[in-house]
């Protein structure tokens, strides 16, 4: 049985242009350009690749074509989430939602191609989080988080 998401491939109008978002905002390493298929591969440094961008058809609309979002867990809790929030704003990204799910706290935002992404940090240990979910207690409460100061 599958146990985790190994990688995600997103369609991008121009993978070369969108690549800057993934390196500059998410801090990913650009590991390979597969020119034959107009793809760019990225890694967080522990795997050969975690995410790839592939050229979308010329007439493809922006946004979620067949999926909701991709979530990226962050280490460092709220302080790191605030830093990433600042980075998103500095990049000009659209932050859509700030949510407290009970077992995690999240910021949802769009990449340059309108794909919805999420940064989150867990607020409880995995076993407790599983019990929390199974009990139907996870939610979508507002999360009052401010971005880190511009100098952070």
Q: At which residue positions do the language-model features occur?
A:
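Short, solvent-exposed beta-strand edge segments and adjacent coil->beta transition regions
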Residues: 3-7, 65-69
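Core segments of cupin and vicinal oxygen chelate
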Residues: 10-51, 55
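Vicinal oxygen chelate
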Residues: 12-16, 71-116, 121-127, 138-152
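Short beta-turn/strand-loop junction motif enriched in small, turn-promoting residues
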Residues: 27-28, 58, 93-94
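Short beta-strand micro-motifs in enzyme catalytic cores
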Residues: 38-40, 68, 105-107
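Acetyl-CoA-dependent GNAT
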Residues: 54-58, 122
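Short glycine/serine/proline-enriched coil/turn segments at secondary-structure junctions
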Residues: 60-63
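Polybasic, low-complexity binding patches
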Residues: 131-137
């Amino acid at each position: 049985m599958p146990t985790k998401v190994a990688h995600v491939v997103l369609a991008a109008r121009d993978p070369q242009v969108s690549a800057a978002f993934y390196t500059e905002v998410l801090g990913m390493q650009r590991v390979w350009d597969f020119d034959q298929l107009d793809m760019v591969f990225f890694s967080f440094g522990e795997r050969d690749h975690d995410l790839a961008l592939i050229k979308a058809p010329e007439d493809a609309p922006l946004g979620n074509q067949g999926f909701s979002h991709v979530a990226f867990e962050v280490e460092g809790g709220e302080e790191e989430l605030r830093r990433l929030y600042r980075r998103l704003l500095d990049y000009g990204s659209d932050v859509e939602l700030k949510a407290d799910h009970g077992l995690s706290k999240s910021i949802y935002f769009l990449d340059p191609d309108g794909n919805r992404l999420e940064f989150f940090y867990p607020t409880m240990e995995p076993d407790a989080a599983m019990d929390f979910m199974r009990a139907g207690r996870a939610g979508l409460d507002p999360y009052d988080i401010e971005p880190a100061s511009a100098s952070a």
